[in-house]
């Protein structure tokens, strides 16, 4: 019986997976309310012991997306979760995400097309019907 070689992920795939894992941990800090600030590409690169440009280029190559796009998408997922799962105001959710409330409203609206308040109202209407 021939011996099958186990394919190891390439270094770019490993780096991309390590970024996603670090990103998941950072998003968990937001969910728990323990994040003191939002991380940038330099923060992730430092934790992964690579240059920020190398990390950015590798993520673009492997995923077809920039680290910023990936980060913002994940942050929006957390924002939606917090708006749905908490009774706190949108301003409190913004602060938990280490954002200024007015910037959070703009950020949220850019992705969802509606404000956090409208998002909650729409969600409440759907679940009461």
Regions flagged by a language model, labelled:
Residues 1-53, 60-62, 66, 71, ...:
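Alpha-helical bundle regulatory/interaction domains
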Residues 111:
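Active-site beta-alpha loop architecture of Rossmann-like, nucleotide-cofactor-dependent enzymes
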């Amino acid at each position: 019986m021939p011996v099958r070689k186990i394919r190891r992920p390439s270094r770019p795939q490993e780096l991309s997976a390590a970024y996603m894992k670090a990103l998941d941990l950072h998003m968990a800090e937001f969910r728990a309310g323990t994040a003191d600030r939002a991380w940038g590409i330099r923060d992730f690169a430092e934790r992964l012991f690579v240059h920020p440009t190398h990390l950015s280029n590798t993520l673009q190559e492997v995923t077809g997306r920039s680290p910023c796009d990936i980060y913002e998408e994940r942050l929006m997922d957390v924002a939606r979760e917090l708006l749905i799962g908490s009774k706190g105001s949108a301003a409190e959710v913004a602060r938990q995400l280490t954002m200024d409330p007015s910037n959070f409203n703009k950020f949220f609206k850019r992705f969802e097309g509606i404000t956090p308040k409208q998002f909650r109202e729409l969600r409440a209407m759907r679940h009461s019907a």
